[in-house]
Amino acid sequence: MTEDLPGLIRHFAGQKQKVFFVHFRDVFGDRHHFIETFHDEGPTDMYACMRAYAEAGFNGPLRPDHVPALEGETNDSFGYTNLGRLFAIGYISGLREAAYGRHPTNYRSA
């Protein structure tokens, strides 16, 4: 949706210090018509975004936003399935560990 999302993150989370809470997700499409994807399936370089948060010194809460359903889930609570959320948390944790470093005091869990 933007050509330089990591640059925007560094600007607003770092220089402006205007990011206080992050809903982390990826989508296909534009702001009018989009489909939410798993964090590792969309067009965005999610690691570059996480690295931008780290470089900006962001230390606030970060959580997955809506997630697609995995095989076997009913999707009764669209966007909030248990297995999809577990996958997202694991993926985000890996990105965060890679971007911020392994030591748990380098970031605060969301």
Question: At which residue positions do the language-model features occur?
Answer:
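Histidine-acidic metal/acid-base catalytic patches
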Residues: 1-110
